[in-house]
C-alpha cells in the first residue's frame, strides 16, 4: 500500500500532536547508519555547490540515549533565496521529504519524512536547512556535552520519558518543558570550550 507524504502546513499543532504522539524508544545502534544512508541520499539530490556541510544532531546522534525515533540532519547551504528554497523543496521531495512549517520569509527550512499512517512503527527523519553561518551551534554544543557525559545523558533520558508521558499529544509543550535542561547543558559545554 502506497503512503502519502504528510502536508504539515495544513495541520494545526493540536492535529499534529494527535496524529503523531510523542514516543520515546530505547537507543538504537542503527541510528548512525540510518543517518549516514540519509546523508548520502541528501548529498546526491542537493547540488554540491549549494551544500556546505551535513551534521547529525539531536538525541539519535548520542550513543546510548533514548529518543524519539527521528534522525535529525542539519544541512548548511548558501543564502536561501526564494529560488533556492523551491529547488531544495523539489529535490527533497524526490527522496520522500515533505515541507514542515516553512515560511517564505525564514532563513531556515525544515522537512520531514516517515509521517504516515504507519507512524507508530516507522523511523522518521527531519532535515533542517540553514544558511551558511546561521547553523545553530547551541544544538551542536548540547549534542557534544551529552556524548561525553553519561550522567547528564541518563538524566536527559529520564526527563524525556517523563515529559513524553505527560505531554504525549502536545509536541510544543514537550519541547518547551525540555528547554531549561537543554539551556543548562548547552551553557556547560560553552563554558567548557572557553
Model regions: which residues?
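Catalytic cores of NTP-dependent nucleotidyl/adenyl transfer enzymes across multiple folds
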Residues: 135-194
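Residues that flank catalytic or metal-binding motifs in active/ligand-binding sites
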Residues: 69-71, 123, 142
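Short, flexible turn/loop "capping" segments at secondary-structure junctions
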Residues: 14-19, 65-68, 119
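Conserved catalytic core of two-metal-ion nucleotidyltransferases
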Residues: 95-134
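Short amphipathic alpha-helices in soluble, non-transmembrane regions
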Residues: 85-95
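Helical scaffold of the NTase/Pol beta-like nucleotidyltransferase catalytic core
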Residues: 1-55, 183
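Short histidine-centered catalytic/ligand-binding loop motif
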Residues: 20-30, 74-80, 142-146
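Active-site nucleotide-donor binding segment shared across nucleotidyl transfer reactions
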Residues: 41-71, 76-81
